[in-house]
Amino acid sequence: MGNILRKGQQIYLAGDMKKQMLLNKDGTPKRKVGRPGRKRIDSEAKSRRTAQNRAAQRAFRDRKEAKMKSLQERVELLEQKDAQNKTTTDFLLCSLKSLLSEITKYRAKNSDDERILAFLDDLQEQQKRENEKGTSTAVSKAAKELPSPNSDENMTVNTSIEVQPHTQENEKVMWNIGSWNAPSLTNSWDSPPGNRTGAVTIGDESINGSEMPDFSLDLVSNDRQTGLEALDYDIHNYFPQHSERLTAEKIDTSACQCEIDQKYLPYETEDDTLFPSVLPLAVGSQCNNICNRKCIGTKPCSNKEIKCDLITSHLLNQKSLASVLPVAASHTKTIRTQSEAIEHISSAISNGKASCYHILEEISSLPKYSSLDIDDLCSELIIKAKCTDDCKIVVKARDLQSALVRQLL
């Protein structure tokens, strides 16, 4: 085998054996391992890495599926909004056309009316073409072509949407309505009936919207009155296409006075209390009543929700006032003046006896008010009212107080 040379802990084999062996501390050679620099494969670590890779892939697929689901929901929401916008646009177009047709009954048709009608026709034609193209179906088709979570990641998706080029026709349809100014309308009440047509002044006939005259509507007469008080005369229409005579007469309100009989006025019940004992009938600092500018109550308004059976029965259940209001007491006193009614209501509030029926009894006894006034009061209150869990209509005390001041007192 050749000579053996010992040098430290190493043994060098001479001759044919040129192998190197390491010895332990006790002189025994160490166990031979594989190639130097390589580690033994750990099957447990390999299985752990495989499980981690599978978990990462599964999480990626879940995130991708959630993203696709959210995109589909957004597409559906946009489609619903688009359909709602189209419905609203159609309704506004029809309303505008009907409004123009009504206006032409009272004045002559001018070039601006024809221009608006032409614009509406073009807009309807454009919407019809868009509906035929089916833009909504194109969006849904693009959503269907999106890859599923189990499909190939390298697959390309065509999500392009066709866009119409900007042409002169589109520019005509997108004509700005805000830049158009209607002709000037001026009311001349002092002119004779034969000269009433002179109140409408037609502006320039130019089609350019920027050169149109400004729109001004002046409905103030010479005596500075507005509303129905200034319409105490006949209005005649002298247009040749409408030869019928239109007459506006003053309404006689004497027949509607005191329509609520005293026998239907109520007695006070504990459950029908509409006002708390300290609720005023006028808004704190803005005590500016029509009734002699007199404040009713001393403490500020309350936000307490008060049940109002009158609105529940009269408006929602479609019951008449005679059936809603119970029979009044025999000692009910008829009040003739508004100041007396205010004094009675003030005393009732100060004594803590104010109720819904008590207020109606005081108000309906006045010749100035009728069931129509009570309907107006209910119509204003129902805007700010809300329904409770027990199907009762409640109104805040502050809203009720301001409604009484505006509508009745």
Swiss-Prot record:
Keywords: Activator, Cadmium resistance, Cytoplasm, Disulfide bond, DNA-binding, Nucleus, Transcription, Transcription regulation. Residues 71-99 are annotated as: Leucine-zipper. GO terms for molecular function: DNA-binding transcription activator activity, RNA polymerase II-specific; transcription cis-regulatory region binding. A motif (Nuclear export signal) lies at residues 372-379. Residues 46-69 are annotated as: Basic motif. SMART domains: BRLZ (SM00338). It comes from the Eukaryota. A motif (Bipartite nuclear localization signal) lies at residues 17-24, 47-54. Residues 26-64, 127-156 are annotated as: Disordered. GO terms for cellular component: cytoplasm; nucleus; RNA polymerase II transcription regulator complex. Induction: CAD1/YAP2 expression is at least partially regulated at the level of mRNA stability. Two small upstream open reading frames (uORF) in its mRNA cause increased RNA decay. The translation initiation factor eIF2 counteracts this effect by causing reinitiation at the functional initiation site, thus suppressing RNA decay. Residues 356-387 are annotated as: c-CRD. One of 8 closely related fungi-specific YAP proteins (YAP1 to YAP8), which all seem to be transcription activators of the environmental stress response and metabolism control pathways and to have similar but not identical DNA binding specificities. Belongs to the bZIP family. YAP subfamily. Transcription activator involved in oxidative stress response and cadmium resistance. Regulates the transcription of genes overrepresented for the function of stabilizing proteins including the inducible Hsp90-family protein HSP82. Preferentially binds to promoters with the core binding site 5'-TTA[CG]TAA-3'. Activity of the transcription factor is controlled through oxidation of specific cysteine residues resulting in the alteration of its subcellular location. Activation by alkyl hydroperoxides or cadmium induces nuclear accumulation and as a result CAD1/YAP2 transcriptional activity. This is AP-1-like transcription factor YAP2. The gene is CAD1.
